[in-house]
Amino acid sequence: MAADIFAKFKKSMEVKFTQEYGSNKQAGGDITGKTEKFLRLGPEQDARKQEMIKAGKEIAEKRGIAFYNPMMHMGAPLGQRAITPYTISGTDIVAEPDDLHYVNNAAMQQMWDDIRRTCIVGLDMAHETLEKRLGKEVTPETINHYLETLNHAMPGAAVVQEMMVETHPALVDDCYVKIFTGDDELADEIDKQYVINVNKMFSEEQAAQIKASIGKTTWQAIHIPTIVSRTTDGAQTSRWAAMQIGMSFISAYAMCAGEAAVADLSFAAKHAALVSMGEMLPARRARGPNEPGGLSFGHLSDIVQTSRVSKDPAKIALEVVGAGCMLYDQIWLGSYMSGGVGFTQYATAAYTDDILDNNTYYDVDYINDKYNGAANLGTDNKVKATLDVVKDIATESTLYGIETYEKFPTALEDHFGGSQRATVLAAASGVACALATGNANAGLSGWYLSMYVHKEAWGRLGFFGFDLQDQCGATNVLSYQGDEGLPDELRGPNYPNYAMNVGHQGGYAGIAQAAHSGRGDAFTVNPLLKVCFADELMPFNFAEPRREFGRGAIREFMPAGERSLVIPAK
């Protein structure tokens, strides 16, 4: 496998640096060459830049105020850097650089939309209220009727009330509710259109793990309209859902809208039986639930679905790294901390041109050769998580990555910032240690050691302050204090020291996943999230995040929440 990935890495470098793209005159040359002439071709060398320049001029003329003009960039007239394409790792998709900015990529937007607009609400507490407080009978037939009512109401349609204004179905066609349960008998009694079938969506072994964890409980997977969460925020998701749940219970079970039991149903939907994707952030960061800063690394690992469809532990982890770098670096930190150009090329370093993949699969072979197949799928084959093991694997991984950069200067040119290289080297080391040990915090330890080895070798990691969390992070891998020593799976973007710097969080998420994909676990932290997103009806395919980003870049991805129905046609 490592040889195949190495060949793919070299092909990505050749596509990027030895083949002409647009009119960048990159044809010929050698990906191991150490010198290259700067041709100073300017932004016009690239087709997408030409399109953007043309659009900028037209918009400026139309609105009468200056707009996009790349010559305002002090470096653009020199045109020193060749504008080269990116190959999406794990695919053959070749993309324009600008098309990997999340603003220009509908798939990236939809990935976050699909997470932000989702919540999970238990049904059992509501059913107990109906039965014990109101004497109502709850049967598969009444549940089916309730779900039919709810799928009418959830997009924003009226029940119980008189003829109210409603949302147009064509604007909210991505909104729906399904249920799932660990009770096969109940699942068989519910109309199949409303059920996420655990036995169908997961392998037999994974389904058994999930059903054992969920037990006889029943849960609603709720996806409110994309257009609603885009207009409001992530905290609106549970409020919107709770309102429609309450109205649907009243209608389906012929309740009196003003009776006291309605308050219990409301409390269950809004609080007691609610599972949000992300936690609320503290006041200084001022974000409600279901915003990126509160989405833990373990939750993201469970949202990504590659583990359902692949038995390759490294690939499963790398898909989470890609999804995490896009979400945490491009959308969260890239807007919250930076804005504008953002941090796109921090993230692309981890999911393009197969550089991280090449390092990781080298590590897999190294581990399997030295530790008797410890990086293969399984639980009995793992090596004990000791400092000696972490030192060995992380050092070998980092040195291989450094040597690859030095052997292929094109890879250095691709990852032109030291902090990009730091991310990739450390992510490979951390994922490798987690795969070998089945222990995510051993993976974190490998990450931090990689940073030390990298800095010792090259003298720096990235821009000033980039390495702050990496210098102090090792002390907290096994700290007894809860806020410092959390398992990696429970950490997130707002964990102490993680909240300030780009280029880290996607790697931490991949490490969390690697510990469990290496073991073949059905989920990382929460089986409810794993099942909720095991649904082919969702616009974004969470089984292949990197490929979806590529489809977005080449403009093949169809998003939800568009407003074309209610705006003038161009």
UniProtKB/Swiss-Prot annotation:
Any one cellular-component term (Gene Ontology): cytoplasm
Ligand binding (coenzyme B): 239, 270-271, 284
Pathway: One-carbon metabolism; methyl-coenzyme M reduction; methane from methyl-coenzyme M: step 1/1
The protein's Enzyme Commission number: 2.8.4.1
Keywords, in A-Z order: Cytoplasm, Metal-binding, Methanogenesis, Methylation, Nickel, Transferase
GO biological process, any: methanogenesis
Modified residues (5-methylarginine): 285
Cofactor descriptive note: Binds 2 coenzyme F430 non-covalently per MCR complex. Coenzyme F430 is a yellow nickel porphinoid. Methyl-coenzyme-M reductase is activated when the enzyme-bound coenzyme F430 is reduced to the Ni(I) oxidation state.
Primary location class: cytoplasm
Catalytic function, reaction form: coenzyme B + methyl-coenzyme M = methane + coenzyme M-coenzyme B heterodisulfide
Statement: the UniProt record of this protein carries the keyword Cell inner membrane: no
Example GO molecular function: coenzyme-B sulfoethylthiotransferase activity
Region forming the signal peptide: none
Residues at which coenzyme F430 binds: 161
Keyword 4Fe-4S: no
Amino acids binding coenzyme M: 346, 464
Entry comment on modification after translation: Is methylated on C5 of Arg-285 by the methyltransferase MA_4551. This post-translational methylation, despite being not essential in vivo, plays a role for the stability and structural integrity of MCR.
Xref: Gene3D superfamilies: 3.30.70.470, Methyl-coenzyme M reductase, alpha/beta subunit, C-terminal, Methyl-coenzyme M Reductase, Chain A, domain 1
Necessary cofactors: coenzyme F430
Subcellular locations according to the entry: Cytoplasm
Entry's family note: Belongs to the methyl-coenzyme M reductase alpha subunit family.
Assembly information from the UniProt record: MCR is a hexamer of two alpha, two beta, and two gamma chains, forming a dimer of heterotrimers.
Family annotation (NCBIfam families): met_CoM_red_alp
Protein name per Swiss-Prot or TrEMBL: Methyl-coenzyme M reductase subunit alpha
Organism whose genome encodes this protein: Methanosarcina acetivorans (strain ATCC 35395 / DSM 2834 / JCM 12185 / C2A)
